[in-house]
């Protein structure tokens, strides 16, 4: 027990801090109910489960990284679409100047109400980010990508000039400024990042690293490694990619969980494919030869045909999804990775 004299000193300090910095700047955990962390769905059932809270956490920094064409931007745009469906305001800072508006619309993004910026320099991009964050009106901001946040000095300099560590210092400074504001405004920030190969690893440790220095690794609450693991074909035609997402860092739930899902060309993440994969794995969907069925009702012959049935029958898809979530929740364990799906030939 704290003696009376020290207790009065603490109360006085609390009052002074509240007066100087606002009520709630310093609280006793026992006096404040610990709130459940809000999240934004990723559009992937498996990844939402792997993240532990049903999606990416609000008020935090997220890093999505991986090799080229692995599905990083697609995953980010799916999160934007999910946020907008729930009434959120989203911004996309397109530092790469490569946003495909038509593709974003196909993924379900409300492009009419999406705030888009194509900045000229890294400083401009991060100033826009800070202004949007401090406004308190934006729920989700995506920056594509860290590698494209080129410092002004580098753009205005000559081609052969050396600018060692300039981008890393720029990122470190920006992250120090906005981390607290993001939490206060309950806004989520997603950085899309690329992979580079380290020089001189000599076989020790991973030869891969991400761009922009180490600051983002420390400030990010969640880091997701996205990789393409297989090509999906139908009648010898490539129709999409099988993608694996690994949560390599997670400050809000246990890390190192993985999820696999299909990214279909022109459509994005196949929710129906995940429902089928996890449904079979958990014995919710029956598989007899090539036929798939649920509660004695045939869904179709082959995975792709069953996906079409679920896509056309949303209530049925929602019912199976609810059963999957219920089973996973009751088991209180890491969501099992589904077996690699068979492609319809």
Swiss-Prot record:
One of its GO terms (molecular function) is ATP hydrolysis activity. Keywords: ATP-binding, Cytoplasm, DNA damage, DNA recombination, DNA repair, DNA-binding, Nucleotide-binding, SOS response. It comes from the Bacteria. InterPro entries: AAA+_ATPase, DNA_recomb/repair_RecA, DNA_recomb/repair_RecA_CS, P-loop_NTPase, RecA-like_C, RecA-like_N, RecA_ATP-bd, RecA_C_sf. Its main location: cytoplasm. ATP binds at residues 66-73. GO terms for biological process: DNA recombination; DNA repair; SOS response. SUPFAM superfamilies: P-loop containing nucleoside triphosphate hydrolases (SSF52540), RecA protein, C-terminal domain (SSF54752). It is found in: Cytoplasm. Pfam families: RecA (PF00154), RecA_C (PF21096). GO terms for cellular component: cytosol. Belongs to the RecA family. Can catalyze the hydrolysis of ATP in the presence of single-stranded DNA, the ATP-dependent uptake of single-stranded DNA by duplex DNA, and the ATP-dependent hybridization of homologous single-stranded DNAs. It interacts with LexA causing its activation and leading to its autocatalytic cleavage. This is Protein RecA. It comes from Helicobacter hepaticus (strain ATCC 51449 / 3B1).
């Amino acid at each position: 027990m704290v003696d009376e004299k020290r207790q009065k000193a603490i109360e006085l300090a609390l009052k002074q801090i509240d007066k100087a910095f606002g009520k709630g700047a310093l609280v006793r955990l026992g006096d404040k109910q610990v709130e459940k962390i809000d999240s934004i769905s990723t559009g992937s059932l498996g990844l939402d489960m792997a993240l532990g809270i049903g999606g990416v956490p609000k008020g935090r920094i997220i890093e999505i990284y991986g090799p080229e064409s692995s599905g990083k931007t697609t995953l980010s745009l799916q999160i934007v679409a999910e946020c907008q469906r729930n009434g959120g305001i989203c911004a996309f800072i397109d530092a790469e100047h490569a946003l495909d508006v038509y593709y974003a619309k196909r993924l379900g993004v409300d492009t009419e109400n999406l705030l888009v910026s194509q900045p000229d320099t890294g400083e401009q991009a991060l100033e826009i980010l800070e202004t949007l964050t401090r406004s308190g009106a934006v729920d989700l901001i995506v920056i594509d990508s860290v590698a494209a946040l080129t410092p002004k000095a580098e753009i205005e300099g000559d081609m052969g000039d050396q600018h060692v560590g300039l981008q890393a210092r720029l990122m470190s400074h920006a992250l120090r400024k906005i981390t607290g504001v993001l939490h206060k405004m309950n806004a989520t920030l997603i950085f899309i990042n690329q992979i580079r190969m380290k020089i001189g690893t000599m076989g020790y440790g991973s030869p891969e690293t991400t761009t922009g220095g180490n600051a983002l690794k420390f400030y990010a609450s969640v880091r997701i490694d996205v990789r393409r693991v297989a090509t999906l074909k139908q009648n010898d035609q490539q129709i999409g990619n099988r993608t694996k997402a690994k949560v390599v860092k997670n400050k809000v739930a246990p890390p190192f969980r993985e999820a696999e899902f299909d990214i279909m060309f022109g459509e994005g993440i196949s929710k129906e494919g995940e429902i089928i994969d996890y449904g079979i794995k958990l014995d919710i969907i029956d598989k007899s030869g090539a036929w798939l069925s649920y509660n004695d009702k045939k869904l179709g012959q082959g995975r792709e045909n069953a996906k079409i049935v679920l896509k056309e029958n949303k209530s049925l898809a929602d019912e199976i999804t609810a059963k999957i979530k219920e089973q996973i929740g009751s088991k209180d364990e890491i969501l099992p990775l589904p077996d690699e799906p068979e492609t319809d030939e």
